[in-house]
């Protein structure tokens, strides 16, 4: 039989990777691509904390945030600055900014302390690096996570070297391994292109990140792993129909495809079955009936409660508290 033509270059998925299950506790840090995969994991019923500092783009901001979590830092007003009617933290995404320092500090410290409490039970730390370019504040010498629209003259912008990233993360991985010997690291490079300096500079930036991660894998072969999200978008989905309107961010379809490839790499057949069961329950609850007081809908809700109880009985790590409360709220007394 004649071979069929192949119009796609397939990326070989890494073999022999440790599995990810619903019993695992996961922390995701990094760029908006970490948000994309994190939302998929959340919808699939996994236990996770997603970007407790908000979206972070460069590797040094991620490592600084992790060190502050390790130390359970308590932020105070001196860590903030006021600009354009809002109080900001240079270490945090703009989603933490607020009109008063008290509001900003409450948002920051509550997320940081929650992440600190979860550290001892973490199984996976998933880090997505977006760019090797950093902004260093001239006055303080601090690499910031977000400029918060301050004038560019306040900052020195430069590209990190492979050696800088490797040295920083070697110390961090060693420190965190001493605190949690079971912790595994999964690195990805965001497929989102940063084109401020042009495509060539973007390639140099991404290459720096890839080389640094490869070196960390060599140094920590039992702890550090890599998922080729960057390569999958650039090779398997080499078409602008897989991008959003800005032609830079992956489209929802591309994110779903990456999720499928992620699932192939890390999920057992049993885990995939649990995901289907979780999503079925949530899909049922999303159904809006015309007659919520009807006997038929009340029976339908009762069946959902039974499904939840059976699934939790088999997989006690699943969290269906919100779904159970919603069912009981809708059930007639």
Describe each model-derived feature in a short phrase:
Residues 261-333:
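Conserved catalytic region of serine esterases and O-acyltransferases that act on ester linkages
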């Amino acid at each position: 039989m004649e071979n069929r033509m192949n119009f796609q270059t397939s990326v070989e998925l890494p073999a022999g990777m440790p599995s990810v299950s619903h019993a695992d506790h996961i922390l995701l840090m990094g760029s908006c691509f970490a948000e994309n995969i994190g939302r998929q994991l959340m919808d699939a019923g996994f236990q996770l904390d997603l970007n407790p500092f908000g979206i972070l783009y460069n590797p040094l901001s991620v490592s600084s945030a992790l060190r502050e979590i390790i130390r359970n830092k308590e932020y105070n007003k001196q860590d903030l600055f006021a600009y354009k009617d809002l109080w900001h933290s240079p270490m945090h995404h703009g989603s933490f900014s607020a009109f008063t320092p008290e509001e900003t500090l409450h948002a920051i410290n509550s997320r940081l302390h929650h992440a600190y409490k979860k550290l001892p039970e973490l199984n996976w730390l998933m880090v997505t690096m977006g760019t090797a370019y950093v902004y260093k504040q001239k006055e303080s010498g601090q690499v910031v996570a977000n400029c918060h629209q301050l004038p560019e003259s306040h900052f020195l912008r430069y590209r990190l070297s492979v050696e800088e990233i490797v040295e920083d993360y070697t110390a961090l991985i060693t420190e965190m391994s001493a605190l949690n010997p079971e912790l595994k690291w999964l690195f990805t490079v965001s497929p989102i292109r940063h084109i401020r300096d042009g495509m060539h500079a973007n390639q140099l930036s991404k290459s720096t990140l890839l080389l640094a991660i490869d070196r960390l894998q060599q140094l920590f072969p039992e702890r550090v792993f890599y998922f080729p999200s960057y390569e999958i978008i650039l090779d398997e989905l080499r078409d602008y129909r897989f991008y959003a309107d800005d032609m830079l961010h992956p489209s929802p379809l591309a994110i779903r495809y990456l999720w499928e490839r992620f699932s192939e790499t890390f999920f057992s057949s049993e885990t995939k079955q649990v995901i289907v069961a979780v999503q079925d329950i949530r899909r049922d609850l999303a159904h809006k009936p015309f007659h919520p007081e009807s006997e038929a809908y009340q029976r339908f809700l009762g069946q959902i409660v039974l499904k939840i109880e059976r699934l939790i009985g088999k997989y006690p790590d699943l969290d269906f508290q919100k779904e159970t409360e919603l069912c009981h709220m809708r059930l007639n007394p």
